[in-house]
Amino acid sequence: MAGSLKNIHRLFLKSLLCCLGCMLRVVELLEGEPLPQSGVPNSLEKLSKKYGSVFTVWLGSTPVVVVSGYQAIKEAFVNQGEEFSGRANYPVIMTISQGYGVLVSSGKRWKDLRRMSLMTLKNFGMGRRTIEQRIQEETKFLIEAIHEYGVVNPKKMICNSIGNVISSIVFGHRFEYNDPMFQLIQKNFPLLSVTYCTKLMHYHAHFTNKTFSFFIPFFQMFNMFPRIVWWFPGKHHRMFAIINQAKDYMRAQAELRLKNLDTSDPQDLLEAFLIKMLEEKDDPNTEFCYDNMVMTAWNLFSAGTETTSSTLRQSFLMMMKYPSIQGKVQKEIDDVIGSRVPTVDDRVKMPYTDAVLHEVQRFMDLAPTSVPHKVIRDTEFHNYLIPEGTMVLPLFSSVLSDPELFKNPDEFDPENFLDENGCFKKNDGFLPFGLGKRVCLGEALARMELFLFFTSLLQRFTFSGTQPPEEINVDPECASFGRIPQSYECYIKVRTVE
């Protein structure tokens, strides 16, 4: 009898998912026709060309205001940054976070947690030597791991390395790559990422296609029917249990630190947060509690691991596609760095390498709409009144592909960031980290990681594809609201520098 009920539940669940697939299409309001299934950002770009810089679409039953183009985005998220600073919530996100953490919160909670997170990163050396040394240490472990392979899909190795940089900030130490707890953490944090970028986990090294065939529609269904989903059996129960296991580990680590806490010298994010908790323990309105600490640590992992590792994977894919560009980068590395360990200070002396990394991020367009915002009050914008709580998407891809800002927006061309003298040239349209009050708080860390990992690996290795360059597809995969690199295997050969 129990087995029959379970099968009935599963059949009903599948029926709901099939219906959901039809309901979740972005619908063009004026004509009532479903948009092309080429990814939400691509579809929104087409609408912006038709309806202008501000328009509304519906995602299922949810109205969403889209802001497109550099000028309109700047007006909204810089000039009216406070009004547009809220974070839109989804039921699945709220179930995982309960509204805690810097990424999903709004108002006072978000401001307090963001200020504390930025100060902690600064104190631990974001842009200074200490974090730089942690990254340099991790590049050595990655280089040793690469030496063990011939043909390889590099995504798991790269993801482990970036995850360990975050681990050193959160926990004060790195893990061995095969450490069971580290692998649990690496499995779990993309789960939070996927709630923002459906399909992202489909390409993650730790999950199978079969797993994703469930989770992709599940997250969508959960957002529409959060109370109903709990009545059905399935992998989602196991998923939430695993997530809670990782969260429990973080809390346990914090409680261990509390026993021997040196309040004058915090060694990691958890200790810095504990000190803040002790300082404000008598404040009934404090936002510094265990729940916010755990979810803020989660946010650093989920936002910092997959994004940076995906960008690095795209970088090496571009080098395989364009071996002449790879050769120029390696020559600049040889001329400026030689055989010593790369440092952040080298970047200003390496305009071509810097331009290549900027162009990879522009071309890839990892987060075309960022994490969805909401307006925190009724807001007038471009002669429209946007009601409080309305979801807002900044269409950053409309800026990164603007021909008025980039001379070759549809091609991979490092010249977009070089002047006529070969010097690095900044561009206001370079917005891969967002804009305004909710700009990525780990931007400086990500820039440091990208430069040091990229130069360290190309200093020692040459990347080549398992097929000719002209057959390599470098176009990122559309993944609902985001873009991710093509999955690939490659040859990583040790360089012989004369």
Task: State each model region's role.
Residues I162, I166, F171, I242-M250, ...:
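Central I-helix of cytochrome P450 enzymes
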Residues K122-M126, T198-H202, F214-F218, M239-L312, ...:
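Conserved cytochrome P450 catalytic core segment spanning the I/J/K helices
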Residues H382, E420-L450, D475-A479:
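Cytochrome P450 heme-thiolate "Cys pocket" and heme-binding signature region
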Residues E33-G52, Q245-D248, A252, R340-N383, ...:
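Conserved cytochrome P450 K-helix E-x-x-R motif and the immediately C-terminal K′/meander segment
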Residues V27-P36, V40-R134, N153-P154, I158-V165, ...:
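Cytochrome P450 substrate-recognition site 1
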